[in-house]
Amino acid sequence: MASNTNEKPQPNPTYNAIYHLPTIESITERGRLDFQHTALRIALGSLYAGHDFVEARLAPRTEGPQPRILDVGTGSGIWAESMAREFPHAQVLGVDLTLVAADSNTPPNCQFGYLDANDGFTSLGDSFDVVHVRSVGAGIRDQIRLVRDVARVLKPGGVFLWGGGELNLYNENYERLPRVEEGQEGWCATNAILTQLREVTLKQGRNTHDFKTLLEDSGYFTYRGQEDAFCPIGAWKEDTPKTAWKQVGELFALNLGNLVQSHGSLLIQSGRDKETIGRWLAVTKEEIETCNPKTHALFRHLWAVRTEAEWTPSAAEAAEAP
C-alpha cells in the first residue's frame, strides 16, 4: 500500500512488519488470499455486500466519466480483477504494499499501484465511486485516519465497503466460544491463539471491532448496513441449494491454518511463552485438520455512503501538508 502509485517500490521482505503476514510475493500468502476471497464470495453469494447500493452507484453512465473503483489492500488483486470483469465499463485500481504484476488474465480496465495506506491517499485524487477495504485492519496504525482518507477520495454518494474477520471462533450454533484456560473442558487451542492475537492488536491500538462507530462519528458517512458471513472451518457443514459450504469450509481451513501459523512469531515477540505458543500451534493444526471442535469464523461486511460534507484536514493533517 506508498503515496506514489506510479513508482514500483523497492522489494519488500518476505514478511511485512506491520501486516504480520507474508507479503504477496510469497506463493503461500497469495494462495491464502485467493482462498479467502473465494470462500467469502461463496458465503456472501456476491463479490460485495450492500449489493443494491453498489450496483446503483456503478451503473453505466451516458454522460461524463464512467465509475471508478478503488481496492485498498488489494492483496493478490483477485477482487479488483473480478470487479473489473463484473463492471467492464468501470475503471478499477487495486493498491497494496507490494505491486501486483498484471498479466494476460488482467482485464484492460483494471490497474494496480503501490500504496502504503498508513501514509494517506493524497496521490489518488477524489473521484472514486466505490472504495473497498477488506482484511487490512491489523496493518492500519490509525483507523480514524483510514476512514478520513477514504472520505477524501470518495465522491459524495459513493459507497465505502469495509470487511474484516473477527479474532474469535463460533460453534455450530453460531455462539461465540467462551474463553477457557488450557486443561479445562472446552478449551480450544485455535481460539486461544486468536484470543492472544486480539489482545496484542488491541494493545497496539488497532481495534477494528467497532468500525461502525468510527464511520458514524466521522461526519463523512451514513452507515447503511452490515452483513455477517459465518464460514465453517473445515468441510463439516452440509451444502445447501444456495451455498457450497463444504468448499467454503475447506478453503477457510487452509486460510485460517496459514493465518494462525504465520502469527506465532508475533505472539512470541510480544512476550508470550515460546514453548506454550509452539504447543498451541501444534494442537491448532490438528483441530483444523480434524474439524474438532466444529467451528465457524465470522467475517463482518459493512457499507456506508459518503455524505455531502466537504472534506477538511485535521490539525495533524494540516501540519503534515507541504
Which functions belong to the PLM regions below?
Residues 138, 162-257:
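Conserved catalytic/acceptor-binding region of the Class I
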Residues 140-142:
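Short N-terminal helix/helix-N-cap motif within the alpha/beta-hydrolase-1
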